Amino acid sequence: MAKRDYYEVLGVNLNATEAEVKKAFRRLAMKYHPDRNPGDKDAEVKFKEAREAYEVLCDSRKRASYDQFGHAGVEQTFGGAGAGGFGFGDLGDIFGDIFGDIFSGARGGQAREQRGADLAYELVLSLEEAVHGLSRTIKVPTWINCKTCNGSGAKGSSPATCPRCNGSGQMRMQHGFLQVQQTCSVCRGRGQVIKDPCTDCHGQGRQQQTKTLSVKIPPGIDTGDRIRLAGEGEAGLFGAPPGDLYVQVRVKPHPLFHREGNDLHSEVPIDFTTAALGGEMEIPTLDGSVRLTIPPETQGGKQFRLRGKGVKALRSGAVGDLICHIVVETPVKLSPEQKDYLKQFAELLKKDEKNHSPRTRNWFDSVKDFFTSK
């Protein structure tokens, strides 16, 4: 039986962040966990399916391999989902937020660090910038570690061990026959308390600041693509690891080209005499202009493909084409003299209409047959 798409299993889109993937798995885990559905084989299968999808999509290397090669990429490179050792420690991270830290005792009762939040930044590019790549400087409002206390939150000293939980960050509670652990209400799971708060950050360990970052944009990037800057998100609380910054790309519309995959498309207007007699014209591309030969009797809607004048693919390196769509323009604002010449020309065409305008003649014949057959 073929495996379902991991994104479909979790109900997230291709650009879902790690936090969104984790949130989706939490929802499914609450619904299908075997402890909540004893004896339900279908729920057990769905839980395992969701757990497998979560394992891959929350691992940046496995996810990149899956995005490029599908299930085969994960199986061939990492020995399949589950080979990385998805254990109960991972489930403790997931279920700790669901069931009020009941599962946190499985991790040895240690205080859990509160990682910094991930940030998102929308970067707007021109088509030329997206196709050729560049480095762009961005400014991101964020939280950084306080420089005065180095993120500890304590003024001129180190935080003290919490007297309530003795530094574990957890309190063991007895509910009938069930013994569970909950986050310490005094230190909020840190295992430490601050007796003399830092005056610069008021004991928070963090300060707000606008960071200036240089982002390298690879050639071939497109709307919807994301660039992950590891560790450039918000600083974690009290020295915990920082989050990541996700740069979301949006490419502005271009007046001459629109992109479909690695191909570029462009409408090329020509007058009706060039369409009838043929000619040559300069065609703009993103790498300069090229000469395009218009053969005689070219019809509107005709497409000319200029090989290798499209976009170089972000991952494979293959180069797309520029596809020129011919639009035959009807002349407007004609003078009386010009109209007379066109009428004379039209009379000449009627003498051999089947040869000069075969599609028009065939259309009229079809219309005539349609009405006479009624």
From Swiss-Prot:
Q: GO CC terms for this protein? A: cytoplasm
Q: Where does Zn(2+) 1 bind?
A: 146, 149, 198, 201
Q: Where is it located?
A: Cytoplasm
| Residues the record lists as binding Zn(2+) 2 | 162, 165, 184, 187
Which residue intervals correspond to the CXXCXGXG motif repeats?
146-153, 162-169, 184-191, 198-205
Q: Which Gene3D superfamilies match?
A: DnaJ domain, Heat shock protein DnaJ, cysteine-rich domain, Urease metallochaperone UreE, N-terminal domain
For this chain's record, the cofactor binding note is: Binds 2 Zn(2+) ions per monomer.
Q: Which GO terms describe its biological process?
A: chaperone cofactor-dependent protein refolding; DNA replication; protein refolding; response to heat
SMART domains associated with the record? DnaJ (SM00271)
**Required cofactors, per record?**
Zn(2+)
Zinc finger regions, CR-type: 133-210
Chief localisation class: cytoplasm
Describe the function of this protein: Participates actively in the response to hyperosmotic and heat shock by preventing the aggregation of stress-denatured proteins and by disaggregating proteins, also in an autonomous, DnaK-independent fashion. Unfolded proteins bind initially to DnaJ; upon interaction with the DnaJ-bound protein, DnaK hydrolyzes its bound ATP, resulting in the formation of a stable complex. GrpE releases ADP from DnaK; ATP binding to DnaK triggers the release of the substrate protein, thus completing the reaction cycle.
Record PANTHER family:
CHAPERONE PROTEIN DNAJ, DNAJ HOMOLOG 1, MITOCHONDRIAL-RELATED
The family assignment reads: Belongs to the DnaJ family.
Q: What is this protein called?
A: Chaperone protein DnaJ
